[in-house]
Each structure stands twice: as C-alpha cells, then as structure tokens.
Amino acid sequence: MAKKQYSGVRESKPGRINDLGTTGKEVEEQFRKGCLKKADRTFAQGLQCQQINSMAALMSLEDSVFISHSPQGCVGCSIMAVDMFRVGQAHRGIKNIRNPRIIVSNVDQKSVVFGGEQKLREAVKKAVERYHPKLAFIYASCASGIIGDDIDAIAYDLQEEYPDTVLVPIHCEGFKSKICASGFDAAFLAINKYILKKESVPKEKGLVNLFAPTTVSYADQKEMERMLHNIGVEVNYIPFYSSHYGKIMRSHIRIR
C-alpha cells in the first residue's frame, strides 16, 4: 500500500491530539491504554495565522523575496516575524541588520468580487524585476484562497519568463487548519517540492539541512549544531541567515 503523503495540515496526522484538557498523569495513563481522545471544542484564532508562520519560517533565507497574495493587513501582522529576524541577526553578530523583502498584492473588495490573479501577476513581476532573487515565495491567504485564485498556475506561467528565479507557491490559507503551526509545515513542504526535488545535483556526504523556524533561539541553534557535530555531521541550519539556494540543493540529509 502506497504511503499517503503528508498534506501539511497537522490535524490530518493519524493519532494526532490537538485539544486536550486534563492532567499529565491522566494523559500518560490514557496514552498507555490507547484510549487518548482529543476534546471537542469550538475554534477561535488566538495566535498568529498560518501565513505569518510560513513567512517567518523562510524570512532569513538569502537571495529571496516574499510575495503575499493578500490584503495589506495580512502583511502588517508579519511585523512580529520581521522583528524576530532582526533580533536574530544581532544575536549572530551581523552588523548590517537588514529587513526581508516583502511585497503584497493588495487584495481588496474589488479583487474578492472579480478575482485578484492579475494583481498577483503584477506583484510577482515587480518583485522579480526589482530584486532579481534566486527564490520568490508566493503566499496564499484566507482571502485569495476563498475566492480561488490559482497561485500555482500563475507561478507556473511566469516561471518560463523568469528562468533565473525559482517561483515557489505556498498554500498557507488560514482556514485549512486549526493549528497555526501548520504554516511552518506548508513552507517546508514547498521547499521540498519546488527546490529540493527540482533538479539533481551532487550531494555533500554528511551535510545536513536542519530545518527550523525563527522561533528557535541562537543558543538552541548552537546546541543542536554541537550535538550533530559530535556524530560527525556538518550542519546547514536553514532557513536561518547564512543559508542560500545552492547549499540547500547540496544537502545529503534533511532533518525537521
């Protein structure tokens, strides 16, 4: 039987428990008996959304531009991730602190009624022609997902026009999952689909891509590098700060 590919929606994993209200002792007992069940509750968004997490996961990747197919407010909410990126640079001794390159297509009421694909095309073209990035990440949003704008088709159509830039659509619509951390998975799945599997290049034996979002501190990063170094593994910690397109492609193993 063929193994079912993970969709990027965390609650789709078999045996996944997202909602639970009990003691640690009861959790252990129920888990051992195989009768652990998630609670039945309503849902309200109390944290950042999936799109913000998808953007935060890749924000420090060099040679990149980030295109949000959304209303302006969605990108405004990403300021938290931008701050984390800037602080992370300072912790790593980077003197010239830089901001990520973010462009928004500005989905408005007219776009919702008549479609916003033309706005996205224009945003992608402006982003690529202005910054000439190696990677251009195209993020879906709640609004663009609800009206059905096809970010995959637009990326496919424009890829031939911009062969020096890899266009990567990321499906991080907020209504797909009740767990905002699914946004991290959406970003990493997109890297695997559009970058790591795009072409075959020589691998560096013993070089590991260690995927982690910007919520991981510099101290945690150094500790993970130390532990892996002890077993003879060189770490390419991505998408943090010093990583780039070519080094991702050369990785021998991937860890998340």
Model-derived features: positions:
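An N-terminal assembly and electron-transfer interface module characteristic of large anaerobic redox
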Residues: 1-256
